[in-house]
Each structure stands twice: as structure tokens, then as C-alpha cells.
Amino acid sequence: VALMTGEVTLLVPRLLQPLVGNSAELALDVGDGATVAQLLDAVAAEFPVFGRRVRDETGELRRFVNIYLDGEDVRRLDGLKTRVAAGQELMVIQSVAGG
């Protein structure tokens, strides 16, 4: 069985872009059966502060961070275990509160 590989696009919000080399988009190599968690692990390996801003100490998404896979909130899918395929788009949204 041949493994399918390709790229997933990770869209980074403006507030987090300085943590990933000021990039609005990252192209991530994805293997067959990759999960959202594995992709976030790969980004965090290169950009550790980004990883800490998006996930807490237990590895779960922080409350104020949402990740969408092709427009669907991953929390409504299979959370961080949601499978990601080549050609899909992950978008990170960070809530901003102020007053």
C-alpha cells in the first residue's frame, strides 16, 4: 500500500504570525492518516512559542483558540485526533478579549 503524501495549508492569524517567522500561511507536509495534533506538533517543533500559545500543558487546545479544517471547527469533528488529508486547509483563530 502506497502512502499518500502532500501538503496541508495552515493559516496563521496576524497576532501569531511573529511566532512563525511572520508568515500568514505555512505549507505542512502531511502523510496518510495524519492528525491535527501531529501537524501542530510539527509546527511546535520548529516554532515552540507558537505551540505553547495554541495548546496548553496537557496538549489540548487552549480555550481561546479554535482550529478549523476546511471551515469546520475541529472540536465538532474529532478534536485533535481529526484526520487531515493533503489539499485541506487548517485555520487557527485566536480570540482576543479587551476592555
Where are these regions (language model features)?
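Ubiquitin-like/PB1-type beta-grasp interaction modules and other compact soluble beta-rich domains
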Residues: 2-98
